[in-house]
């Protein structure tokens, strides 16, 4: 009798162990499957973030890419033809149709540097252009028409409407370039080697 009862006790224990062993894999499988949506969401978010981050980079690249195209061969009068944002040679007549008196807009100048073309009060092309590269650390300085000055967004340097430095840390004024209109109508730049009319000093860039 004692042996029989021990067999009866052992049987339920063995059955219970079998049931536990069958249940455990199911629990693990459920846990694993519950992680799948999280991973999918994470991957989707990564793609969205990567795509979103690429937009401003692409925009900036398109905006400044025009200033890295090879310079034009020249304007026929010894100068180098100025180019617009699309890389086309600038013709004074066409430019003045869309750029009014007092306008200062970027073009591609000597050595491919971004250079401001200036429209005078009587709606002609100014006799000089301004290199837009800040003399502090080389940022491109935007023209702020509302304040009638150039203001560097990198470290706060400021230049007046003629490109003369009026606030540091930039140590020097923006470089000048001669700007002329050739007989063909092309706007051309050439190196400024004379005295800087803004400071009365020799040009630091020559």
Swiss-Prot record:
Record's subcellular location: Plastid, Chloroplast thylakoid membrane
Family matches, as Pfam families: Rieske (PF00355), TM_PetC (PF25471)
Positions of disulphide bridges: 139-154
Keyword Electron transport appears in the UniProt entry: yes
InterPro entries per record: Rieske_2Fe-2S, Rieske_2Fe-2S_sf, Rieske_Fe-S_prot, Rieske_Fe-S_prot_C
Cofactors that this protein relies on: [2Fe-2S] cluster
Alphabetical keyword list: 2Fe-2S, Chloroplast, Disulfide bond, Electron transport, Iron, Iron-sulfur, Membrane, Metal-binding, Plastid, Thylakoid, Transit peptide, Translocase, Transmembrane, Transmembrane helix, Transport
Record: transit peptide: 1-29
GO molecular function: 2 iron, 2 sulfur cluster binding; metal ion binding; plastoquinol--plastocyanin reductase activity
Record membrane topology: Single-pass membrane protein
Other comments on record: This protein is 1 of 2 subunits of the cytochrome b6-f complex that are encoded in the nucleus. The Rieske iron-sulfur protein is a high potential 2Fe-2S protein.
Name of the protein this chain belongs to: Cytochrome b6-f complex iron-sulfur subunit, chloroplastic
Organism of provenance: Chlamydomonas reinhardtii (Chlamydomonas smithii)
Gene name linked to the record: petC
């Amino acid at each position: 009798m004692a042996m029989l009862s021990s067999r009866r006790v052992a049987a339920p224990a063995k059955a219970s162990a079998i049931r536990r062993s069958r249940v455990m894999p199911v629990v693990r499988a459920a846990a694993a499957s519950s992680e799948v949506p999280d991973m999918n969401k994470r991957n989707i978010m990564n793609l969205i973030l990567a795509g979103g981050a690429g937009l401003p980079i692409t925009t900036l690249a398109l905006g400044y890419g025009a200033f890295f195209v090879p310079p034009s061969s020249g304007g026929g009068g010894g100068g180098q033809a100025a180019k617009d944002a699309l890389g086309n040679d600038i013709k004074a007549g066409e430019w003045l149709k869309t750029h009014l008196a007092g306008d200062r807009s970027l073009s591609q100048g000597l050595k491919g540097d971004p250079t401001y073309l200036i429209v005078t009060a009587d709606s002609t092309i100014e006799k000089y252009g301004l290199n837009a590269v800040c003399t502090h650390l080389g940022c491109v300085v935007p023209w702020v028409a509302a304040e009638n000055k150039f203001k560097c967004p990198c470290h706060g340097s400021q230049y007046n409407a003629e490109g003369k430095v009026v606030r540091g840390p930039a140590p020097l004024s923006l470089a000048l370039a001669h700007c002329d209109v050739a007989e063909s109508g092309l706007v051309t730049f050439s190196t400024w080697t004379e005295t800087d009319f803004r400071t009365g000093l020799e040009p630091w860039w020559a």
